[in-house]
């Protein structure tokens, strides 16, 4: 398995159709032209397991993040990437848990960074996470998480908007 440095990603057009490929490390990479997956691990009390990114991450080190997230590699479907990322980051086989797709988003119709599919995993167990990706984590309600981000706690760029779009009731 290759590292992030040699990940090949599909380039997509405004309709999320594959039009080419690019290496993740290519300086010409524009995130709105690639696909990503994100997932939230949610417990029976409605809390989300929110990890803190490893300090060695090049993007958003030490920041709060989605439970699972990553780029869809070239040739993968969104679901295949979700399965791979859940296994790599949380040591979870998704079919051992209850899970569902939550939403799909376009960067051309939202302020989100990329084309993305968002999933939800259900479990009351705290995951055994990959320490290369994650330095720790905690269970938070969506409201508490949004309050911490609003108060200035470092978070990955799309986290607050994803929580609002997927978990906050319309006001």
Curated annotation (Swiss-Prot):
Gene Ontology annotations of biological process type: nucleotide metabolic process
Molecular function GO terms recorded: hydrolase activity; magnesium ion binding; nucleotide binding
Ligand binding (Mg(2+)): 85, 89
Keywords of the record: Hydrolase, Magnesium, Metal-binding, Nucleotide-binding
Signal peptide start and end residues: none
Gene3D superfamilies with a match to the protein in the record: Nucleoside Triphosphate Pyrophosphohydrolase
Regulation: Inhibited by zinc, calcium or copper ions.
Motif Nudix box, chain ranges: 69-91
Protein name per UniProt: Nudix hydrolase DR_0079
Organism from which the protein derives: Deinococcus radiodurans (strain ATCC 13939 / DSM 20539 / JCM 16871 / CCUG 27074 / LMG 4051 / NBRC 15346 / NCIMB 9279 / VKM B-1422 / R1)
